[in-house]
Amino acid sequence: MAVRLMKQCTCLLREATRLVPTVAPVGRLRLAGVACKTLTSSVSSPSSGSLTELLGKEQVFTPYPEHQEVDYLIEKATRPEELLELLGGDHSLHHNHAALILIRLSYLLSEKPKEKALLVEDARFQQLVRLVDSQITSVWHGTLVKLLRSLYTLVLPQGSKELRSVEQEVRWRLRRLKYKHLVFLAESCAPFMKEQHSKELLAELLRHLERRWTEISDSRTLVSMMTMAGHLSESLMNRLEDKCLELVEQFGPDELRKVLMTLAAQSRRSVPLLRAISYHLVQKPFPMTKGMLLDLAYAYGKLSFHQTQVAQRLAADLLPFIPSMTPGEVARCAKSFAFLKWLNLPLFEAFTQHLLNSAQDVSLSHLCSVLLAFARLNFHPEQEDQFFNLVHEKLDSVLGSLEPALQVDLVWALCVLQQVQVAELQTVLHPGLHTRFLESKSPKDQSTFQKLVHINSTALLEYPEYKGPFLPASAVAPSPSPSNKKMTPLQKELQDALKALLGNNDTGSLEVATQYGWVLDAEVLLDAEGHFLPLRDFVAPHLAQPVGNQPLPPGAKRIAFLRWEFPNFNSRSKDLLGRFVLARRHVLAAGFLVVDVPYYEWLDLKSEWQKTAYLKDKMRKAVAEELAK
């Protein structure tokens, strides 16, 4: 055994002595370690590899050379010519230098597209690209990912062999790259990969980012990934949201803003993450700038995420900034709170005052945005006359020249706020405008036409001096509601209670579609004694196609039941949104007594008897209030 061991040691030492001259100086110490390791391991492992194989494996990762003069020349270069001259000079370029020159070239020409085009045609540049291609396997990881970004920004031809070579090298190394390098690729190269048909590289990059998501340890990387790459992969975004929940305590106000804006841009209503962010916004007294507050309000509004304490803080923190806001920022802020359905009276009064103070600088588009926000929330400012005088003054000469859908939106908003003028009604009810919406089948155009029906109803019911034009009778005829439309719990319970109350189909109707663009939950007729009358026997002017012909008997009352769901109200309020205030006003103007059935009252009713008694009591109160007038 000892003799065999001595023979093996002698062979290994002879081989090591022969190989020493071929090893670079920086590797000599490493060689000793390798030889020693080989000697010891060969005793216990007869299958261990030869020294040559170990040396080959050891030399795969060459050490980064010391900083040379050429490195300083590359870093200090201010003109492309200085960099290209390095190729033909006496400088010794190692395997990274050519790539570094390309990276520096792309930086110098980042905002000079004309010079980029000339550079790509330069023979020296083409020589440089070929040199990089020949050395690509020796380029270090960090330099390689920057090189790919630089080649994209230099706009090489899509079929460029050298570009494809760099992309392929990146693909081969993806598994070995650090996560920060993957993040760099996602941040800087993903848009180019999509545009330049490098979809395989992009897909593989996203797979590696998703598999290694647990390596994210800092908030900056996480937020950057959500912003730059989250929209490219649903599964990756899900992982990033999970990581956000883990790291959200480390976020500062700007990082919270970026996450919220990313969620808003992708319309991702991630409730657990939104709750966590809201908690930290409320609990931590972050100092926030005007821009941050505006972005937060926009994101919460876009995602329709209602959090009372956050909305209160945003409104309170924004109030001191209003005098310094531009009209555009006021419009954006008002729209955000309108989407949130949050009416903060001091804030909205400040909006009004600021617009009146800067009336000369307010553009029509910004004023329109504020008007639509006011209408959504049914907000009537204290300086109502001055504000609407400004609105009419701005609209007076240009309303008819605006985009048709915008014309309808503006006049509809004025109808909601009871500030519309006859000339404005005539502009949007003109046959030349409504025909295009009547014939269209797109949901957006149908929604606009529904607003036209509401405007037409306003003209009919609230403006007796208005003489026309009106929408044609065929246009206002309600279309049949889809049979598969899902009923809300309140709607179903209310219908069941009404059926139990009425008992007979002749004494009431459910889901009554009127010619005014509104649907009544139920309609009944009461005589002077308070007894039900058969509906079908009497005239019904609110229907597009009346069924009866007898006039109502003296003292008879027509009653409409209107249910109000949770989304019909301003947030944390019992005040209806503007659209539903308009509906109630129209129903009253059409000659009905209204029985309101709000969700917050209905929820307190547990038994069928309570629900029936509630409806009877509401009818008696409606009749008593009418008689008391």
Swiss-Prot record:
Q: Which UniProt key words apply to this protein?
A: Mitochondrion, Transit peptide
GO molecular function list: RNA binding
Tell me the ranges covered by the RAP domain, including all copies: 559-617
UniProt similarity note: Belongs to the FAST kinase family.
What is this protein identified as?
A: FAST kinase domain-containing protein 4
GO terms for cellular component? mitochondrial matrix; mitochondrion; ribonucleoprotein granule
**Pfam families for this protein:** FAST_1, FAST_2, RAP
Which compartments is it annotated to reside in?
Mitochondrion matrix
Briefly, what is this protein's role?
Answer: Plays a role in processing of mitochondrial RNA precursors and in stabilization of a subset of mature mitochondrial RNA species, such as MT-CO1, MT-CO2, MT-CYB, MT-CO3, MT-ND3, MT-ND5 and MT-ATP8/6. May play a role in cell cycle progression.
Matching PANTHER family:
FAST KINASE DOMAIN-CONTAINING PROTEIN 4, FAST LEU-RICH DOMAIN-CONTAINING
Provide one Gene Ontology biological process annotation: mitochondrial mRNA processing
Q: What InterPro entries does UniProt report for this protein, alphabetically?
A: FAST_2, FAST_kinase, FAST_Leu-rich, RAP
